[in-house]
């Protein structure tokens, strides 16, 4: 992550902003999660790893002079998004099967939507949006 933030800063205009959104796991679960496997890491995002908010901010501090202007956790709203995605997916099940996908594909993605929705509803997962800038950015708040 350090390299990521270093690259972002090097590409950012002096008075620019950088916005990112990421799914997160609580810091107290991060180390165990990183060393283990689960449904998502096995079937949906192989090789993926959810960061914690602390890991993101630590990497930012270590590799750049960026600062945080705003943080918002929209995870609870993401629950609704996933439920609607699932409903839309299932409403189009016949079309998906007609494309050549099988029932296992349908079950895998239905499980993914419900599994993730439960994580957001229980606040086991977060979905953060963070606005970064540089110290002294006089354009912040001026409508860019």
Tell me the role of every PLM-derived stretch:
Residues 1-2, 132:
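Internal amphipathic alpha-helical segments of the cytochrome P450 catalytic fold
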Residues 2-19:
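A short glycine-rich, Lys/Arg-flanked "PGG" loop and its adjoining helix->strand segment in the class I
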Residues 24-140, 144:
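Substrate-binding/catalytic lobe of Class I Rossmann-like enzymes that use SAM or dcSAM, i.e.
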């Amino acid at each position: 992550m350090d390299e990521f933030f270093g690259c972002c800063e090097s590409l950012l205009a002096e008075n620019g902003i950088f916005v990112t959104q990421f799914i997160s796991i609580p810091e107290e679960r991060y180390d165990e999660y990183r060393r283990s496997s689960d449904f998502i890491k096995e079937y949906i995002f192989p090789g993926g790893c959810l960061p914690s908010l602390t890991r993101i901010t630590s990497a930012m501090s270590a590799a750049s002079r960026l600062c945080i202007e705003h943080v918002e956790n929209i995870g609870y709203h993401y629950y609704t998004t996933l439920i609607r995605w699932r409903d839309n997916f299932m409403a189009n099940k016949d079309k998906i099967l007609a494309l050549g996908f099988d029932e296992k594909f349908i079950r895998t993605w239905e499980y993914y939507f419900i599994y993730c929705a439960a994580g957001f509803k229980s606040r086991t997962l977060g979905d953060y949006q963070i606005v970064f800038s540089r110290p002294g950015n006089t354009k912040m708040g001026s409508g860019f």
